[in-house]
Amino acid sequence: MADTIFGSGCDQWVCPNDRQLALRAKLHTGWSVHTYQTEKQRKSQSLSPAEVEAILQVIQRAERLDILEQQRVGRLVERLETMRRNVMGNGLSQCLLCGEVLGFLGSSSVFCKDCRKKVCTKCGIEASPSQKRPLWLCKICSEQREVWKRSGAWFYKGIPKFILPLKIPGQADHPSFRPLPVEPAEQEPRSTETSRVYTWARGRVVSSDSDSDSDLSSSSLDDRLRPAGVRDPKGNKPWGESGGSVESLKMGPTRPASCLSGSQSSLASETGTGSADPQGGPRTLAGPRGPR
């Protein structure tokens, strides 16, 4: 064995000194199998496009899972912060969460172990009921412990990276933290009982929101059907004296002006021919003669 290591043959291997090793390290040369590898051999060992695509898919899937985990932790943190913002009491004489008065005249109180605040029994949670001395926690501290347990903060000694849910309504990722969609206020149909104002006019009920044509037709019909001598509820003159439709009904249908002018001219011609002077001149009618 000694001859093998310290032999005098020319082909025997000798361990290089530190200087040579440092020089070979700078020149990237050595006794490795990859030292004298050619460029063609290196290209032949490169990844194929299918392998690159598979690796990229694995990386993208890991990134998506990481984002989902951050969103899940963000929802837990948002819920905890919402509970902290909604406190109503001071934790001394009032319940920290609901603000109920504590003491002899109020409800019984318990002492939270973590935040050292007083809460009522409804807002407190008994953490260790099996022990002789019960351990009480408020809902905020209990939720904080739950966040540390479910987010892995107990392992990392702190809350990991998270993404808070969006504040825009309807854009939150989780339905429990998504605010209710704001629906546009629908215009309620106007009730006919409340929107219509009925007035007693001319013996019948007339709606104020009816069309003007229906009002005119109904009023003209009432004028025709109302007997003469009945007084108008809005005026003092009887219906027969108001020059309304009663006289027109008594006198019958009116004739056109052309027909009247024609009949008057014919009547005048007949009268003129009967009383005309034989000499051709018009004859004047004399008035009643007085006593001679």
UniProtKB/Swiss-Prot annotation:
<feature type="binding site">
    <location>
        <position position="95"/>
    </location>
    <ligand>
        <name>Zn(2+) 1</name>
    </ligand>
</feature>
<comment type="subunit">
    <text>Recruited to dense-core vesicles through specific interaction with RAB27A in endocrine cells. Interacts with RAB3A, RAB3B, RAB3C and RAB3D. Interacts with ZYX.</text>
</comment>
<dbReference type="InterPro" id="IPR041857">
    <property type="entry name" value="Noc2_FYVE"/>
</dbReference>
<dbReference type="GO" id="GO:0006886">
    <property type="term" value="P:intracellular protein transport"/>
</dbReference>
<dbReference type="GO" id="GO:0045202">
    <property type="term" value="C:synapse"/>
</dbReference>
<keyword id="KW-0963">Cytoplasm</keyword>
<feature type="zinc finger region" description="FYVE-type">
    <location>
        <begin position="89"/>
        <end position="146"/>
    </location>
</feature>
<keyword id="KW-0862">Zinc</keyword>
<dbReference type="InterPro" id="IPR013083">
    <property type="entry name" value="Znf_RING/FYVE/PHD"/>
</dbReference>
<feature type="domain" description="RabBD">
    <location>
        <begin position="41"/>
        <end position="158"/>
    </location>
</feature>
<protein>
    <recommendedName>
        <fullName>Rab effector Noc2</fullName>
    </recommendedName>
</protein>
<dbReference type="GO" id="GO:0098793">
    <property type="term" value="C:presynapse"/>
</dbReference>
<dbReference type="GO" id="GO:0031267">
    <property type="term" value="F:small GTPase binding"/>
</dbReference>
<keyword id="KW-0968">Cytoplasmic vesicle</keyword>
<feature type="compositionally biased region" description="Basic and acidic residues">
    <location>
        <begin position="221"/>
        <end position="235"/>
    </location>
</feature>
<dbReference type="InterPro" id="IPR011011">
    <property type="entry name" value="Znf_FYVE_PHD"/>
</dbReference>
<feature type="binding site">
    <location>
        <position position="112"/>
    </location>
    <ligand>
        <name>Zn(2+) 2</name>
    </ligand>
</feature>
<keyword id="KW-0597">Phosphoprotein</keyword>
<feature type="binding site">
    <location>
        <position position="98"/>
    </location>
    <ligand>
        <name>Zn(2+) 1</name>
    </ligand>
</feature>
<dbReference type="InterPro" id="IPR041282">
    <property type="entry name" value="FYVE_2"/>
</dbReference>
<dbReference type="GO" id="GO:0008270">
    <property type="term" value="F:zinc ion binding"/>
</dbReference>
<feature type="binding site">
    <location>
        <position position="120"/>
    </location>
    <ligand>
        <name>Zn(2+) 1</name>
    </ligand>
</feature>
<keyword id="KW-0268">Exocytosis</keyword>
<feature type="modified residue" description="Phosphoserine">
    <location>
        <position position="248"/>
    </location>
</feature>
<keyword id="KW-0863">Zinc-finger</keyword>
<dbReference type="Pfam" id="PF02318">
    <property type="entry name" value="FYVE_2"/>
</dbReference>
<dbReference type="GO" id="GO:0099502">
    <property type="term" value="P:calcium-dependent activation of synaptic vesicle fusion"/>
</dbReference>
<feature type="binding site">
    <location>
        <position position="123"/>
    </location>
    <ligand>
        <name>Zn(2+) 1</name>
    </ligand>
</feature>
<feature type="region of interest" description="Disordered">
    <location>
        <begin position="175"/>
        <end position="292"/>
    </location>
</feature>
<keyword id="KW-0472">Membrane</keyword>
<dbReference type="InterPro" id="IPR010911">
    <property type="entry name" value="Rab_BD"/>
</dbReference>
<comment type="function">
    <text>Rab GTPase effector involved in the late steps of regulated exocytosis, both in endocrine and exocrine cells.</text>
</comment>
<dbReference type="GO" id="GO:0030658">
    <property type="term" value="C:transport vesicle membrane"/>
</dbReference>
<feature type="binding site">
    <location>
        <position position="138"/>
    </location>
    <ligand>
        <name>Zn(2+) 2</name>
    </ligand>
</feature>
<keyword id="KW-0479">Metal-binding</keyword>
<feature type="compositionally biased region" description="Low complexity">
    <location>
        <begin position="257"/>
        <end position="269"/>
    </location>
</feature>
<dbReference type="GO" id="GO:0045956">
    <property type="term" value="P:positive regulation of calcium ion-dependent exocytosis"/>
</dbReference>
<feature type="binding site">
    <location>
        <position position="141"/>
    </location>
    <ligand>
        <name>Zn(2+) 2</name>
    </ligand>
</feature>
<dbReference type="InterPro" id="IPR043566">
    <property type="entry name" value="Rabphilin/DOC2/Noc2"/>
</dbReference>
<feature type="binding site">
    <location>
        <position position="115"/>
    </location>
    <ligand>
        <name>Zn(2+) 2</name>
    </ligand>
</feature>
<dbReference type="InterPro" id="IPR017455">
    <property type="entry name" value="Znf_FYVE-rel"/>
</dbReference>
